[in-house]
Amino acid sequence: MKVAVFPGSFDPITWGHIDLIKRSLAIFDKVVVLVAKNKSKKYLLSDIERFTLTKDVISSLNFLNVFVDSYSGFIVDYALINSIKFIVRGIRAFNDFDIEFERYLVNNKLNFKIDTIFLPSSAEHLYVRSDFVKELMRKKDVDLSHFVPELVFNRLKSKFIDK
């Protein structure tokens, strides 16, 4: 069975993430969506909120063989512990590639047996970023349906609009 881990902060999960998960399923038998905990990053949502929201969205989409987990260490360590040989990373633009390629090089030094698969974003999701979602949520009456599922919008609404 070919298994991949798709790590991210998912603060929040977007249609871009979901597209990459769906496309990963065409390559791998099982995909673990890993909600990463990075102590140096500042998140809008708590670790539990990011995990729960990601899990709820994945459940609502009825994906088979997609599982949600969380981890606070190096992704290659998670992969090794769970016998996963592939890490999937999404690439939107050239600057993403530079960052992700550096991550790949570091991961490869830590464990050369775990490979990284780069998936370019679909054209309709090239501009979708969690940061943009958080920025746009500050505006009232904004349509975010191109960025996030309704479930995500409704959860974020309580953090922004309902205050």
UniProtKB/Swiss-Prot annotation:
Reversibly transfers an adenylyl group from ATP to 4'-phosphopantetheine, yielding dephospho-CoA (dPCoA) and pyrophosphate. Homohexamer. The record marks 17 as: Transition state stabilizer. Pathway: Cofactor biosynthesis; coenzyme A biosynthesis; CoA from (R)-pantothenate: step 4/5. It catalyses: (R)-4'-phosphopantetheine + ATP + H(+) = 3'-dephospho-CoA + diphosphate. Its cofactor is Mg(2+). Its main location: cytoplasm. GO terms for biological process: coenzyme A biosynthetic process. It comes from the Bacteria. This is Phosphopantetheine adenylyltransferase. Substrate binds at residues 9, 41, 75, 89. Signal peptide: none annotated.
